[in-house]
Amino acid sequence: LRNYVLSLANTGVRHGTEALGLRWRNIEWYLRDGERYLAVSVDGKTNKRTAIARDRVVDFLWRQALLNPSIWALDFDELIAAELDEAVFTTRLSAPVTVHNLNRTFNALLDELGLKTGADGRTRTLYSWRHFYATQDLERGVSTHALSKQMGNSTVMLDKHYSKYSPLLNAEVHSGRKKKH
């Protein structure tokens, strides 16, 4: 659950179909101007797209790979280069995890921690990590256009859900105290 949640929170990928459909062959290194970025190709609700993962996702995916005995012999770069058709999110027995088990485990954890609802009174779900991702990017000043491409949403949908947060998330920019990059 840990690696799954952290991956959701740092890619903007949808819980369920997109994340659980992810295979090692869908992950690759993207090189640009001498820099290496982790690219994740997903087939989702709207269409196929490639998302750039935050750098720390490498650690979460490597930790996930170490849970799968069928790929232990490979280091991370070898694993990516091998383009395996193996599911990324598996149990320790190499079986793909299910939405039902993830939801059940996540809900039990939230209950145990007393975190079932957010400050806004809404029930938290694994999909909440997608909202977390979007909010974090908007706070960093990422445009709704760029974010829509990353997340596979329309700018209209992003504006509908997040426009009320934008002035608050970027108060230092709107106040003139800090320039947007």
Give residue spans per PLM region.
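Basic, Lys/Arg- and aromatic-enriched nucleic-acid-binding interface segment
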Residues: 1-16, 35-37, 83, 130
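Active-site-proximal segment of tyrosine recombinases
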Residues: 18-20, 124-125, 134, 141-153
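Catalytic-site neighborhood detector that most strongly recognizes the C-terminal catalytic loop/helix
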Residues: 35, 42-47, 151-175
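Key DNA-contact positions within bacterial/archaeal DNA-binding proteins
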Residues: 17, 100, 156
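Short basic/aromatic active-site micro-motif
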Residues: 1-2, 95, 99-103, 117-140
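C-terminal catalytic core of Y-nucleophile DNA break-rejoin enzymes
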Residues: 42-66, 81-108, 125
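Short alpha-helical segment immediately N-terminal to, or the first helix within
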Residues: 7-8, 136-140, 150, 161
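Conserved tyrosine-mediated DNA breakage-rejoining catalytic core shared by Y-recombinases
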Residues: 11, 20-69, 73-79
